[in-house]
Each structure stands twice: as C-alpha cells, then as structure tokens.
C-alpha cells in the first residue's frame, strides 16, 4: 500500500532514479541525458514551497511523484500550470498515479489555477488513459518533435479546465 505525502528536496535522488529509468529504457521522456539528484533539486526548488508537489512512498521508498509547475515564465500564463508525473516502473497499474494526480489537481484548484496542461509522448497509453480519466482532453499533437531510439516521436497536448 502506498502512502501519499508532500514532496521535498530529500526525495530528489529517488526521483532521479525513477526519471532515469524512463530516459534509458523508453521514449516517454524526450531526453537522452541522465539526471542527478542535484539536477532534480534544481528542477523542484522553485516548486517545493509554491506549487503542489506529492510523492508516493511504499516501505520507505519513493515510488512515484507528481507536481505542478509554471508552464511558461511570463506572468500572463500564471494561471496555467503544467503537470509532471512519473511512477517507478514497478509501481504502475496500482492506481498510484491516480492518487498522486488527484491530490495535485485538488491543490491546483484551491490555488485558483485556471488550466492544467500536460505533454505526453503519443502512444504512452497508460499516461494518456490516466489523464483522460481525470478530465484532461486531447487538444492536439505536435508531430515528430522528438527523436529517440532511431525514430521520430509525437508529443500530445492534454488540457484540463479547473474554473
């Protein structure tokens, strides 16, 4: 059974491990560069005290994380946040992603967020289903914007209205 709790910078090593699995073994992440715990700290530093950030833990080990962050730096986009969510490959299919995403969505709603946006590699069916189940709508596809493992990849844009 997983426990959902607020995330913090002490979780960054485990987050990097989860993230790096997908970098090395899938096209879920449009990157070939492995991340360190310090890289993850820099990523979440502006998030920790300002935006919703949760981790799932089982037997004392972080097995997933989800947070909201600025979609764009310009203040005119301030009421639209982007969602980032990853689960350990061993933790998929256990509704942990739903628990994490629900907490982040609820917190975003209470913050007065107008829209949530998520970019998903087209064909990542578990992630597409997760977002659709939580009210995200497919808004469009950016064709062949990524290239990994010898093939071009599409990025799908999902949007959820909160207000």
Predicted regions and their residues:
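Glycine-rich phosphate/pyrophosphate-binding loop shared by adenosine-nucleotide-utilizing enzymes
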Residues: 2, 61-65, 153
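Conserved GNAT-fold acetyl-CoA-binding loop/helix
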Residues: 16-43
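Acetyl-CoA-dependent GNAT
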Residues: 33-90, 101-102, 161-162
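Conserved catalytic-core motifs of GNAT/GCN5-like acyltransferases
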Residues: 70, 117-120, 132, 137-154
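Active-site acidic-Proline motif in GNAT/NAT acetyltransferases
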Residues: 85-90, 94, 106, 122-123
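Conserved acetyl-CoA-binding loop-helix of GNAT-fold acetyltransferases
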Residues: 93-106, 129-133
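Conserved GNAT acetyl-CoA-binding A-motif
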Residues: 108-120
